[in-house]
């Protein structure tokens, strides 16, 4: 785990210091539910259907299969899709809990929030694709969390993104951010970014987007304020509208840095720092396997799926006229284009 990653986790813990924790009761959840025979029953609650989330879910199933839990053999998967609706997500969480499942996998912070709200303390929950589990009520730190909850934490490595941005734009002074403050992930990461920007004596310019239709106007507002680079954090609006955002950035010759591996291959995205979605899901699948075999979630720290990697887009760099520094080329996990 990098220094910036550890710093993010400390900030997360502090931000959720007032959250109520479920007690670590004597009856720790884990393993098969009482009296159950036949295939294990796995509930999967997915907040949004976009490629990165779909790949994460596939990774979960791969992680389970690699540890002996295979759909169609000894594992029954009950998948529910919330289509980006918090109300629907809550209803589906209740539906899965009523289906007498052995374990609930929550994909996305809103899905985790709904799962925690619906599940009794005896039902294990494993989460992934989640930037802010503390804000969803999972616990106060990586090791002090609800007895029935564990999972993977993918808080954007904002410090590393800024370091990369400063190498790509040497005279960087102003950084732009488009975000939806109504989203817990987005508002939380916006504050992390603001702190990281201040530490580097830079300026952060924010504009709000609550819908895809807001993107062009909000982008133009950032442009008019003279931002020299745009940072994308966890946000469902910019996630869904990333192709549009990348096209706007390319047209404006504005460097765009993101946190989703799928973003890195989009023309207009210059760099990405983050985790592969398949890697995130696989690690969550491994955690789910441990829980199904009887390990108490309380004993499994909430954890990142590994160290974040760097992806660079050479085609975007050429179009922007930005040379890729040798130090970044050496560090990069992938150079596309």
What is the role of each PLM region?
Residues 2-337:
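Short hydrophobic alpha-helices and adjacent helix-cap/hinge residues
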């Amino acid at each position: 785990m990098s220094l910036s990653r550890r710093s993010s986790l400390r900030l997360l813990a502090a931000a959720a210091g007032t959250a109520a924790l479920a007690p670590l009761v004597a009856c720790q959840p884990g393993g098969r539910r009482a009296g159950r025979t036949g295939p294990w029953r796995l509930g999967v609650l997915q907040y949004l259907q976009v490629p990165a989330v779909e790949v994460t879910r596939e990774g979960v199933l791969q992680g389970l299969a690699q540890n002996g839990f295979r759909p169609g053999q000894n594992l029954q998967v009950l998948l529910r899709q919330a289509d980006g609706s918090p109300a629907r997500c809550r209803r589906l969480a209740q539906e899965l809990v009523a289906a007498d499942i052995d374990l609930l996998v929550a994909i996305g912070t809103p899905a985790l929030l709904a799962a925690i709200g619906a599940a009794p303390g005896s039902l294990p929950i494993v989460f992934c694709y989640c930037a802010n589990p503390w804000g969803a009520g999972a616990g106060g730190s990586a090791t002090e969390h609800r007895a029935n909850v564990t999972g993977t934490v993918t808080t954007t490595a904002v410090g590393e993104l800024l370091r990369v941005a400063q190498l790509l734009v040497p005279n960087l002074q102003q950084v732009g951010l488009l975000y939806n403050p109504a989203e817990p992930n987005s508002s939380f990461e916006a504050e992390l970014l603001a702190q990281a920007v201040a530490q580097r004596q830079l300026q952060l310019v924010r504009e709000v987007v609550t819908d895809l239709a807001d993107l062009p106007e909000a982008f133009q507002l950032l442009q008019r304020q003279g931002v020299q680079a745009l940072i994308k954090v966890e946000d469902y609006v910019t996630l869904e509208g990333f192709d549009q955002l990348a096209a706007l950035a390319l047209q404006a010759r504005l460097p765009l840095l993101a946190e989703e591996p799928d973003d890195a291959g989009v023309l207009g995205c210059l760099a990405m720092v983050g985790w592969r979605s398949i890697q995130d899901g696989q690690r969550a699948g491994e955690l789910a396997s441990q829980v199904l075999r009887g390990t108490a979630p309380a004993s499994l720290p909430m954890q990142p799926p590994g160290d974040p990697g760097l992806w660079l887009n050479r085609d975007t760099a050429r179009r922007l006229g930005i040379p890729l520094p040798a130090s970044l080329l050496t560090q990069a996990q992938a150079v596309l284009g």
